[in-house]
Amino acid sequence: MSAKFFEESTPVAFAGQDAGPAPAFRWYDKDRLVHGRRLEDHLRFAVCYWHSLCWPGGDPFGGETFLRPWHHGTDAMAQARAKADVAFELFRLLDVPFFTFHDVDAAPEGASLAESVANLNAIADLFEAKMASAKVRLLWGTANLFTHRRYMAGAATNPDPDIFTYAAGQVRAALEVTHRLGGQNYVLWGGREGYETLLNTDLKRELDQLGRFVSLVVEHKHKIGFNGPILIEPKPKEPTKHQYDFDVATCYGFLARYDLLKDVKLNIEQNHAILAGHSFHHEVALAEALGVFGSLDVNRGDDLLGWDTDQFAMNVPELALVFHEILNRGGFTSGGLNFDAKIRRQSIDPDDLIHAHVGSMDACARAFLAAADMLDAGALTAPLDKRYEGWAGPEGRAILGGQRSLADLADRALGPGFDPQPRSGRQEYLESLVNRYV
């Protein structure tokens, strides 16, 4: 674009607690060393293309409010190139290491799949050229298999195998572009992989179709030499009444059933967790416990609303517990913190995009530093070890190691003087302890 979009022109930098009114980081000092790694390398922030650059500000009761110049015109590819110019300027101003995108975020759909793929490859060429002189890299790419009307009954789970085939072609193109751009992961989100009513749904058939589709993606990943994991993103509902990737536990069962645990991990989102009736902390902790944690879509939902509001993450105590869980198990590998979040409909100034990201990056940094302090002090890990210390002893190890039968345990329980007593869970103490850090 020839016209300047953002008022800001200087990349946002760390200024500390005395920062003035201009955009600045008060907590996010990217070069600060925490547990031997730079804060930037721990948090691995990514800006998402769709909410930041594609969303027009509409809702079910009203149309667009943002009036982005690249949303209007007669040349769709020219609009896509203009959008890319603003995107990479946003990445530069925020000084983020990563971005993410869907295929149709970046390039317009054509009259055929072949035309859509050609458009995507042309914009990928542009991305490649821009990345050659920029800091930003690709955290992950994905294909949009939920917006077009052909996918109203799903993509992989569609009753029509021709639509399954079309979706396969779309994913192949998106996966190959992700690989070409050096993407570190590839995401599959099944927004329409579910049902509206069981009256017209064959559950077993659709689950088998979904398992086969993900297996095909894994096979192609290996064929082209893509080394990153495939990530599935749990969500219980919206847009469908019930989605097959309901939550972490459901996804784990699906991956185990179709022998996909080796190659597929999970991309977990806060707003999706609360829609499933879980806390963000629960979903991350369970994914870590089951060995399927991959990455985070960091945002927040409104606890009083029953839909995906995708607000920017600002809840430091909530984030601190999540980061404590991740840091305690070694931190991110290929994953990161993707801002799957959108500014509010009334936030119509272009620089609102900058303020939103800066505020959320600072909240994440503040939470991460608190998590590191808690971990260093053993604030939560020491009480946890104490709570389960019996299982680290000889008898606990013997039980878990298969050296005791049910009869062995029953005989011991029936023995004289065997009267184990409960101990306090100390929940209130632990909650107050967390508050000392956040």
From Swiss-Prot:
Residues noted as binding Mg(2+) 1 in the record, renumbered to the chain:
233, 269, 297, 340
Question: Where does the record place the catalytic residues?
Answer: 102, 105
Task: Name one molecular function that GO assigns to this entry.
Answer: xylose isomerase activity
Kindly list the places in or outside the cell where this protein is found, as annotated in its UniProt entry.
Answer: Cytoplasm
Kindly state one GO CC term assigned in the UniProt record: cytoplasm
Q: What is its EC number?
A: 5.3.1.5
* Record's catalysed reaction(s): alpha-D-xylose = alpha-D-xylulofuranose
Please give the biological process terms from Gene Ontology that the record holds.
D-xylose catabolic process
Q: Binding positions for Mg(2+) 2?
A: 269, 272, 308, 310
Q: Does the keyword S-adenosyl-L-methionine apply?
A: no
Q: Required co-factor? A: Mg(2+)
> Which free-text remark accompanies the cofactor?
Binds 2 magnesium ions per subunit.
Q: How does it assemble?
A: Homotetramer.
**Record-stated family:** Belongs to the xylose isomerase family.
- This chain's protein is named Xylose isomerase
Tell me which species this is from. Answer: Bradyrhizobium diazoefficiens (strain JCM 10833 / BCRC 13528 / IAM 13628 / NBRC 14792 / USDA 110)
